[in-house]
């Protein structure tokens, strides 16, 4: 289940549903002898799942580190859960999801929420934050490339980069 409908996400024929806590624990028990990491991403927005906090706690109990990929729209709502999760290793934020949807907020509001979350994570935790942006593409529409340019300029300004981060 996702709160967006991005054009770049693959469609599926299966019914939309959330992974429940019982099934998640079963999967954790199956994979924990084989890995130290799990990844919550693809085919849905992990921050939308009502069991997120339990998932993170159960992973911690088993010594599993969690990496999450999100569209970033629910970071503010889930901030406390994420900041307090002892299992959370990395949060990847797909910035390109904003342009693929009609949103009730402006890009600036969305991006400021993302940056505010990253600032707090950097000040208070060891969690890694990664902003993802699809590369410039001559075949893409002018609007997509213009938003990429806007995002990279904002990143350059926020973090004081003198060189373009896209180079």
Question: Across the structure, where does each feature detected by a protein language model lie?
Answer:
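Conserved alpha-helical substructure of the radical SAM core
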Residues: 1-91, 102-109
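Radical SAM enzyme [4Fe-4S]-AdoMet core and its adjacent flexible, acidic
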Residues: 19, 57, 62, 84-167
């Amino acid at each position: 289940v996702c709160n967006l409908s991005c054009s770049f996400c693959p469609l599926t024929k299966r019914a939309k549903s959330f992974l429940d806590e019982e099934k998640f624990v079963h999967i954790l028990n199956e994979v924990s002898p084989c890995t130290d990491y799990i990844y919550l991403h693809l085919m849905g927005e992990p921050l939308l799942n009502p069991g997120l906090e339990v998932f993170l706690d159960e992973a911690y109990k088993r010594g599993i580190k969690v990496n999450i990929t999100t569209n970033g729209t629910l970071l503010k709502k889930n901030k406390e859960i994420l900041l307090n999760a002892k299992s959370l290793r990395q949060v990847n934020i797909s910035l390109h999801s904003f342009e693929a949807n009609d949103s009730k907020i402006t890009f600036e509001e969305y991006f400021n929420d993302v940056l505010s979350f990253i600032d707090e994570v950097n000040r208070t935790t060891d969690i890694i934050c990664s902003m993802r942006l699809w590369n410039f593409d001559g075949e893409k529409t002018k609007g997509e490339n213009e938003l990429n340019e806007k995002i990279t300029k904002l990143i350059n300004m926020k973090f004081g980069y003198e060189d373009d981060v896209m180079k």
